[in-house]
Amino acid sequence: AEEMDRADRDRGVPLVRIGGIAGKTDQATREAGILRDLKYHAGLLSLGAMSKAPDDELIAHCKAVAEIFPLVGFYLQPAVGGRALPYSFWRRFAEIENVVAIKMAPFNRYQTLDVVRAIAESGRDDIALYTGNDDNIVMDLLTPHRFVVGPPGPPTPATPHPVPKTSERRIVGGLLGHWSVWTKTAVELLERCKA
């Protein structure tokens, strides 16, 4: 925290402080409290310690941590300690009030789309989506995702053939381990993707 305070003194825009949170609920809630006390902005919650827990237990765990501190969900690929999480998990996760973002790193297009669709269908426009899919960075950043989120309204004289309600979501940035080495170039690439 002291290093970040020093770095912020020389910046026009302050750093966003996201700390890691791990462990089962007792440990994770303690870590969330520490991040809060250190004036971080949010905590990236690893579910690795609960890899065998049923979804109901995972949601209860996430809610307990979110009661203490703003939460960034983390979808980590199974090959490195994560687990497959269905659309239904992410739809319920989106209902947790203090969720501010999700880092998606399942390295699987369909699992990534499950998260994006769950957030789009939840109506939570305040949840930011970040890619951690090192194998698909640029496409994740460039692709708009559009989903039908509601039925069409009744026909009217102005709209005799109403269309279903849709929602578009975009992945707004990358939270990638290797980007910490090439930060300047990564930021330039992100800006080019957004242009």
Question: Which ranges hold each PLM region?
Answer:
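Catalytic alpha/beta core domains of metabolic enzymes, predominantly
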Residues: 64-72, 77-195
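Active-site beta->alpha loop and helix N-cap motifs at the rims of alpha/beta catalytic domains
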Residues: 1-87
